Amino acid sequence: HPSYAAAVTLTEKDARVADDAGRVQRRTLVVLSLALVLGGLGVSGAVTGGGLLVAEVSGRESLAGLGQTSVVLGAAVMAVPLARLSARFGRRIGLASGYAAGVVGAALVVVGSAAPSTLVLLLGLTLFGTAVAAGLQSRFAATDLSPPARVGRDLSVVVWMTSVGAVVGPNVAQPAAATGAALGLPGVSGIFVWSGAGIVVAAVLVLLALRPDPLLLARRRRAEATGADDPPRPSLRATFAGIGASPPARLAFASVVLAHAAMVGLMVMTPLHLDHGGHGLRVVGVVISVHVAGMYLFSPLVGAAADAVGEVAVIAIGALTMAAGGVLAATAPSTASTTVGVALFLLGIGWSCCSVAGAALLTSSVPPELRPSAQGATD
């Protein structure tokens, strides 16, 4: 029967499309994961050394907090431009551009530490934050082709891979410092020599291997399914209006933003706090590694929980865990590195719950045409 034959043909075509999308999604997850291993190695090493380097170059410990502040500021300022770049040209160009800018930032950090110039150093750290923004947006790139039931798990797989580079990164601080000294630079700046090298490889990998582009493919599939052209890219005002119009999106936005603010506020001063307690780079590196392990290591379980019991429940668990870690960190003396490590581990787990579940909730709570800009605005 003609109608039956047409239905069978349509079913077979849908199956082939789904199978092709599945293969592309698996490849996308592999490429993003490998890039984040390399990028995570660089970024987490910078967390360990940024504040110490600012204090060393400026000669003022009171300015140490500006190191991580500059990185976070750079990530925040560049998040929306990178999202717009991705919306126009695809994730491949957006992410590779972010990593490339981070490499330039790492080079400026080295120049600023050698000069020495605190201003150039802070400018480099700010530009280095663009690589952080690219890493954060990678988790959203992992969901472009995800079926609705797998958004949390696909996102968390990519976040989990960050843990490999991020946990190792702080522990290469000492050999990286030796590299800096061998080059005649302030020792801590060697961390950024290693960081820049890792991010270069991440940029090249994304640029060459993230094909077909997941965002452009997802957009094309939607257009074919609906028969409609893609709507124009929304303005920043329209993006925030779209987030504000959806209660789940508002919760997701608040979860990601507030969790990140609380986490960074405590993490940024930990190396200096431990330094005041007489601990060296090795202990600082271990504590930051424990913190980063909490942030990323359990993300697959967090993503699975978000898909199974709901993102809101996981966000609530994360908020309570962060509160416990924050109280412990606030009361821990600088000599108690173990207590500080436990506090930052709890802080990391809570951040993971709020960030992974919040990002998954945001992705599912805004229309497809708003997603890249909403994701960038949230970051």
Feature names for model-found ranges:
Residues V37, T118-A133, T339-C353:
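Hydrophobic core of transmembrane alpha-helices in multi-pass small-molecule transporters
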Residues A100-A115, T321-S334:
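C-terminal ends and interior cores of transmembrane alpha-helices
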Residues F298, A306, V312-G358:
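C-terminal transmembrane helical hairpin of 12-TM major facilitator-type secondary transporters
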Residues L125-M161:
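Cytoplasmic helix-loop-helix junction between adjacent transmembrane helices
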Residues A173-Q174, A178, G196-A223:
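C-terminal membrane-cytosol helix-exit motif in multi-pass small-molecule transporters
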Residues T9-R26, R211-F253:
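Juxtamembrane intracellular "pre-TM" segments in multi-pass secondary transporters
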Residues M78-R91, L297-E311:
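Helix-to-loop junctions at the C-terminal end of transmembrane segments
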Residues G50, A133-P147, C353-V366:
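Intracellular juxtamembrane helix-capping segments at the cytosolic ends
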